[in-house]
Amino acid sequence: MLAKRIIPCLDIKNGRTVKGVNFVDLRDAGDPVELAEIYSREGADELVFLDISATEERRKTLVNMVRSVAEKINIPFTVGGGISSVEDVDILLNNGADKVSINSSAVKNPQLINDLAQKFGSQCVVVAIDAKQIDGQWIVHLVGGKVPTELNLFDWAVEVAERGAGEILFTSMDNDGTKNGFANEALAKLSELVNIPIIASGGAGNIQHFVDSFKEGKADAALAASVFHFKEIEIKALKQELRKNGVEVRL
């Protein structure tokens, strides 16, 4: 059985980490490279960087950050945010990113998934899906969850997998930020429908939530931000607890 993965997520704006980070020993809480090193040391399996800046300079800034992170850590990392072309991906992968995450651009142009998978291989194509329940249906949303689409989560996930995505990063917007646990029912259904790894996101509040995402949600990986950034959960302790609960992890 493949080990389950724990993935801290960092929001990046203009080359800096945003959304509050509370590491006492940090010289500069806004430095994504320093944070990446700490998480890598603490036992994170992978990292995700989501670029939320919208400046003209963003690509250059992002490339510089990716290069610096790649020099400092030896765990895989994914970069997402504003990626909409083969050229965007080429630049990021050439500068050291292991994977890219696409979201809105995949919905607007599904062929992009095929193109990226064909050119770079499925293993580096992550499709992020943000969804929330409306009248009992899981509906895909865009623009950080502000814009609803006509797409059903499960139909879209199947299409994404068929087009060559290597992984799906599913964020439940109903759970995101609540610290009440992941959307395990939806996660389990996704795992049944597609045979690519599912990364659970949205709702982590305590260690039990991670246990549940793997055991009930059948997730392959679990992603979180604030519980790690604010030291509410230490990755080493989390992994030891997961192992005690019969979840295979790399210690």
Swiss-Prot record:
Subunit comment: Heterodimer of HisH and HisF.
Name recorded for this polypeptide: Imidazole glycerol phosphate synthase subunit HisF
CC terms in the record's Gene Ontology section: cytoplasm
Family recorded in the similarity comment: Belongs to the HisA/HisF family.
Family matches, as SUPFAM superfamilies: Ribulose-phoshate binding barrel (SSF51366)
Protein source organism: Flavobacterium johnsoniae (strain ATCC 17061 / DSM 2064 / JCM 8514 / BCRC 14874 / CCUG 350202 / NBRC 14942 / NCIMB 11054 / UW101)
Major site of localization recorded for this protein: cytoplasm
Catalytic activities: 5-[(5-phospho-1-deoxy-D-ribulos-1-ylimino)methylamino]-1-(5-phospho-beta-D-ribosyl)imidazole-4-carboxamide + L-glutamine = D-erythro-1-(imidazol-4-yl)glycerol 3-phosphate + 5-amino-1-(5-phospho-beta-D-ribosyl)imidazole-4-carboxamide + L-glutamate + H(+)
Pathway: Amino-acid biosynthesis; L-histidine biosynthesis; L-histidine from 5-phospho-alpha-D-ribose 1-diphosphate: step 5/9
HAMAP family: HisF
Entry keyword NADP: no
Enzyme class: lyase
Subcellular location: Cytoplasm
GO terms under biological process: L-histidine biosynthetic process
UniProt EC number: 4.3.2.10
Keywords linked to the UniProt accession: Amino-acid biosynthesis, Cytoplasm, Histidine biosynthesis, Lyase
An example molecular function term from Gene Ontology annotations: imidazoleglycerol-phosphate synthase activity
Xref: NCBIfam families: hisF
CDD domains cross-referenced by the UniProt entry: HisF
Encoding gene, per UniProt annotation: hisF
Function noted in UniProt: IGPS catalyzes the conversion of PRFAR and glutamine to IGP, AICAR and glutamate. The HisF subunit catalyzes the cyclization activity that produces IGP and AICAR from PRFAR using the ammonia provided by the HisH subunit.
Active site: 11, 130
